[in-house]
């Protein structure tokens, strides 16, 4: 794991002046973990080297999981090479995997194990054992896989007993987590359905849709093919789908747009100017659209060859459907505290099933700081009030910690409890935040 050490509590020092600086954030966690899985799936053909890969708890448990499944992974961060010296799609026929609190690793490796042959068990920290995965397990059972929750409650630990994806396909709900859909899509080209006409049908609303689009774009880069019937919402994979699923020799990973949101928000809150390098509007990551919300609030947003810049301005409250960019809900919550009126965040009920119940947690902590918060099933409304510093809880949630810290850039006395939880996706966050000053 990363060698960064953290105190039990960290007081945020308000900025003496508005920042005017470029910022470089690490590689995208979402892209890194997808690329690791895609590289593993294509590694019987050749090795794939990822550049710009994020080193964090989430990506390190993914690397550990792939190694335990028998893949060769050489991690010289931010450069990672993945290979497979054996003839099997999943080299080992048995493995016990521990994914800590990494949702992407749990969902993606559950599907990867299902595409192999053998018996596998996947487990995580206590919070992971509370996060639902039954929708994915049910879909895998439709694919002919023995997939179950060890305790019978629809949450990890997960047990997989499989001879491959031999069923005709599955229907998968997307209203709990888009990662269930992405997990199935990445392994679908390797199905062993006798008819070689393997279908994945989407059922109901799809949350965080840009992450599925990210998965599709990355699969295309790896050479996968499929047909999609939009009227029926069905992906079909046939005998040709994995014929060229060999991937690139090298794959460059974008900076993390979710991480960038904290620095764009810092510009908004302080009236400063921050450019996050290496990102543009054509990013694979939907979270770059967080700057559009900031623009609606009164910020000025610019794009140049080096990155995307946010200039802070007088902030207005907004009414925002954040379903597509729900990882930035907490960031917006912090910015909303400095607006001239209420901000309503809608259509994000699914974030109650993240590292913590993010709606309830955000409401509780912003109230401590002085904001008025109305909590609803699918979101919340934040009305600014007189803010004062206090110790805030992070619920062991990296995004809660990074978002609440933004309030401390203007309000003295904000203390972050358990600041080390940022190691999940951004181990160097506190160093980079301090550099804004």
Locations of the language-model features?
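Short, structured segments at the rim of ligand-binding sites
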Residues: 1-437
């Amino acid at each position: 794991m990363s060698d960064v050490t953290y105190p039990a509590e960290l007081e945020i020092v308000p900025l003496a002046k508005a920042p005017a600086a470029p910022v470089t954030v690490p590689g995208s966690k979402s892209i890194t973990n997808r690329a690791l899985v895609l590289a593993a799936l294509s590694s019987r053909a050749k090795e794939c080297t990822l550049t710009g890969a994020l080193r964090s708890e989430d990506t390190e448990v993914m690397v550990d999981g792939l190694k335990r499944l028998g893949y060769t992974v050489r991690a010289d961060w931010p450069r990672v090479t993945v290979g497979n010296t054996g003839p099997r799609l999943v080299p080992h026929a048995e493995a016990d995997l521990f994914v800590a609190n990494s949702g992407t690793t749990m969902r993606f490796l559950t599907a990867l194990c299902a595409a192999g042959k053998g018996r596998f068990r996947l487990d995580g920290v206590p919070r992971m054992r509370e996060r639902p995965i039954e929708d994915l397990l049910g879909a895998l059972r439709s694919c002919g896989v023995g997939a179950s929750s060890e305790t019978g409650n629809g949450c990890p630990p997960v047990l997989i007993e499989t001879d491959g994806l031999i069923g005709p396909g599955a229907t998968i709900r997307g209203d709990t987590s888009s990662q269930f859909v992405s997990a199935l899509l990445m392994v679908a080209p390797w199905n062993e359905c006798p008819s070689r006409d393997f279908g994945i049908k989407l059922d109901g609303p799809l949350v965080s849709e840009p992450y599925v689009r990210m998965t599709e774009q990355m699969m295309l880069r790896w050479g996968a093919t499929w047909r999609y019937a939009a009227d029926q919402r069905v992906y079909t994979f046939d005998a040709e789908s994995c014929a060229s699923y060999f991937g690139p020799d090298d794959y460059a990973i974008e900076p993390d747009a979710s991480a960038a949101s904290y620095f764009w928000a810092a510009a908004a809150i302080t009236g400063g100017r921050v450019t996050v390098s290496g990102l543009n509007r054509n990013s694979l990551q939907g979270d770059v659209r967080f700057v559009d919300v900031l623009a609606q609030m009164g910020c000025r947003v610019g794009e140049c060859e080096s990155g995307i810049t946010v200039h802070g301005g007088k902030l207005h409250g907004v009414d925002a459907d954040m379903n597509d960019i729900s990882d930035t809900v907490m960031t917006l919550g912090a910015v909303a505290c400095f607006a001239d009126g209420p901000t309503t965040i809608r259509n994000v009920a699914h974030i109650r099933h993240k590292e913590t119940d993010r709606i309830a947690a955000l409401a509780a902590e912003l109230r401590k700081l002085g904001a008025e918060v109305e909590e609803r099933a699918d979101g919340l409304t934040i009305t600014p009030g007189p803010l004062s510093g206090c110790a805030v809880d992070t619920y062991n949630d990296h995004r809660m910690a990074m978002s609440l810290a933004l309030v401390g850039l203007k309000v003295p006395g904000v203390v972050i409890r358990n600041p080390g939880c940022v190691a999940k996706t951004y181990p160097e966050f506190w160093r980079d935040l301090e550099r804004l000053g």
